[in-house]
Amino acid sequence: MSILTQIDQWPSDNAVSVVVNGNGAIIDQHGDTARVYPLASVTKLLSAYTFLVALEEEAITLENPAGPEGSTVHHLLAHTAGYDFDSEAIRFAVGTKRGYSNFGFEKLAEHLEQQTGIRMSEYAQEAVFAPLAMANTEIAGSCAKDGRSTAADLAKFAAELLNPTIVAQQTLRDATRVHFENLAGILPGYGRQNPNDWGLGFEIRSSKSPHWTGASHPASTFGHFGQSGTFLWVDPEHRLACVTLTDKDFGQWAVDAWAPFNEQVLNSQTA
């Protein structure tokens, strides 16, 4: 029996999980992969990838001023610009802490639109969703939290993160390393982490504890989870990815369930 059937015991009405290998193939799945789910902050992975395309196209640069005084695109992508979680209030000086911010990502979308004249949702559609044939995916509002997609589409995206075709391998490799090292901060739902490592929009597992991935996941594991009860992780060392979507908001149930589930998913494919 598949490890993935554990999701049937979670307190959600609907759930789906898919595992993708280094060849981009789905090697395990459970649940309706065609059902559309709100992604919440997993949206940031789609947005981050869109920003990487924009960087390669030189529509924007990491050095472009954006956000509060002294901040750049680089700071906003790495959650070090100083913004509050969901408002323009400034919580700390630029580059001194890791302050996870929806507002910061929304400022990135504004900057991209100002530089290109193209709405973020349209840029994502043209740059990422259409090339990957993600026909049931959209960003319908905030680029930080208003994405909608299916497990089938996100499996295609996970395959892209394992074997990039839209951006250069080096671009993705650079985006999924730690930027602005040794910064402490709060990982929502899991408390203060020191360091609270992040790449360019991608959360990096590093040495964080507690965490939503498994204890055996390599430090290089990257991804994101969302308040709507969703997550996507990529383990570049073992060439493996997992997409899991539910319709139960994140809470203590997820803190209790996700890490052991992800540990078993990893072990089932690497033992």
Regions found by a protein language model. Name each.
Residues 1-38, 96-97, 113-118, 122-126, ...:
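Catalytic loop of the DD-peptidase/beta-lactamase superfamily, centered on the K-T-G motif
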Residues 6, 49-53:
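Residue-level detector of alpha-helical secondary structure
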Residues 38-42, 46, 54-91, 100-103, ...:
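Active-site helix/loop module of the DD-peptidase/beta-lactamase fold
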Residues 46-49, 103-110, 152-156:
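Well-ordered alpha-helical segments within folded domains of soluble proteins
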Residues 52-55, 108-114, 161:
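Well-ordered alpha-helical scaffold segments within catalytic/enzyme domains
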